[in-house]
Amino acid sequence: DLKWEGRDFMYNPEQPVFEEQPESNIEIAYGIEDVPKPWWKAVLFALQITLVDFTPFMWAAGFASLAGIDQPDFVPTLLCACFFCMGICTFLQTTVGNRLPIVQGSSSALMSSMGNIAAVYGLPAVWGASLIGGLIQTILGITKTVSKVRVFLPPVVVGSVVTAIGFVAARIAVQWTFSRQEPLYLVLALISFLLALILKFKTKGMVSQGFILITVVIVGVVVSSFLGIFDWNAVYAAPWIKIPRLFPFTGLSGQPNAVITFTAAAIIGGFSGYMGAIFESVGDYAATCAACDEIYRVKHIDKGIMASGLGCMITALFGGLPCTSYTQNIGIVAATGVASRRVTQYAGVLFLLYGFCPKMAYILAGIPKPVIGAVFLISAASIMFSGIDS
């Protein structure tokens, strides 16, 4: 049996990962198993999640650039596939995975590795590398391999992990806030930040918990439309319905005719991205538990990695980019106190619907990033302070 500082490391799914659990200073309005009532309140909280966790728009364009693909229909089709798979993966994680309020979506690390594979070996090799990488990740979760790293994690690590993830979230927020440096966008960002602060700390109940949604709708949609910077043309041009299908890019001009190929170099290169995503997920699970005031248990690692792997295998079949846990959603939980996994399941359903309705997806894309970034700064700060206190 493995022993470390007097602890027994025989496998026990209910065993806490850390001997000393952090005390969260976050006021939880809805716990993991709570269901906000009435139903429309849960739907609004879910919509709030989708307003922040919509980065497939960035990763799809980045992937196309790395892959050297410039066909006009490629990015819109990839966007729909990513949202569709994002919904499946999120619902899978919150239902049969670790059952934490975690959103699964495309990540920069996996996007970069898969984009490089596409540039050298073509899209069929990307789906092959994604499928094998997801299979290996699933096996790692089923065999409980990843959870064994807990023997190297002393209790003091939990606060450091949560704080580090808070800094990552803050970096994302700052990048979004200053993604457009024209004076008008910076003023919108400042207005968004101040309005979000007022709603969060000077109001109570539904308004305080929904400060992200309210701020983004008022400033990001209404005010931006009035100022003429919300891109409604892309929304009007997008179709209402687009049905996802298996291997949607087969026969794409300039790409190999094969549906899927398995190339050793592509698989190895792709799995390097998967390994980074796996260890990032382990940290995200710790931060999520800290934000939810939930004990971080061994089962959260194993079931989470297994569900993430299964989700990546599904994305390979539908032509989406591999999915991993999203740091942004931890910030939403920490800032709003809404830790209900039912809300996150509803968000998964909304992402699924975005995959069927490109017009709705483009409405999200039209919201100026500085508005989203300014609001998300508050969420990132909540994560950092939670980690420092623990």
Predicted features, each with a name:
Residues 114-119, 329-344, 349-355:
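Interfacial segments of multi-pass membrane proteins
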Residues 8, 13-14, 67, 71-74, ...:
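Flexible hinge motifs at transmembrane-helix junctions and intramembrane kinks/re-entrant loops
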Residues 119-231, 348-390:
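Membrane-embedded alpha-helical modules
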Residues 4-101, 109-119:
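N-terminal signal-anchor module of multipass membrane proteins
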Residues 64-92, 96, 268-341:
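Membrane-embedded helical hairpins/re-entrant loop segments and their flanking transmembrane helices
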Residues 42-62, 258-283:
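Core transmembrane alpha-helical segments of multi-pass membrane transporters/permeases
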Residues 47-51, 153, 157, 182, ...:
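Hydrophobic alpha-helical transmembrane segments of multi-pass membrane proteins
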Residues 98-110, 151-158, 208-211, 320-329, ...:
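Short, non-helical or kinked segments that cap or interrupt transmembrane helices
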